[in-house]
């Protein structure tokens, strides 16, 4: 009689643990969309990032870009979606020197990949911070083509 009771108790505890884990999920939803996983070098690669609550309310957030190779961050850049696509600072990634603030949606048509990154498996990471709710990393696998 003790074994069925113990099995039922363990099953109930496991279900409670899973339910508790599900409610402890990230307090906001963030998505990253891009046109392709194989962008062309030295050409515009537009991206869109959205941030909202689970109920659909738009949230104010900040974003930075990180470039990851073999699990290690090799470069950090700051979004500047309003910069001229052909400007020197946009090509060098130095138009901004701080995280880019936005509400709900960030559309950046100015992301470009250098020719030296062609053929290398990289991850494009957008680090999203929402004040009071935490940070999320949005990773997107990329292999640049010439």
Please give the residue ranges for each predicted region:
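Short glycine/proline/serine/threonine-rich loop/turn segments at secondary-structure transition edges
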Residues: 110-123
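Structural beta-strand segments of beta-rich domains
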Residues: 43-47
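Short flexible loop/turn segments that cap and initiate beta-strands
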Residues: 52-80, 122
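Enriched for extracellular/lumenal, surface-exposed ectodomains of secreted and cell-surface proteins
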Residues: 123-134
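Short beta-strand segments of immunoglobulin-like
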Residues: 33-39
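Bacterial N-terminal signal peptides
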Residues: 8-17
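Short beta-strand elements
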Residues: 132-146
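Solvent-exposed serine/threonine-rich low-complexity stretches and specific carbohydrate-binding patches
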Residues: 73-104, 141
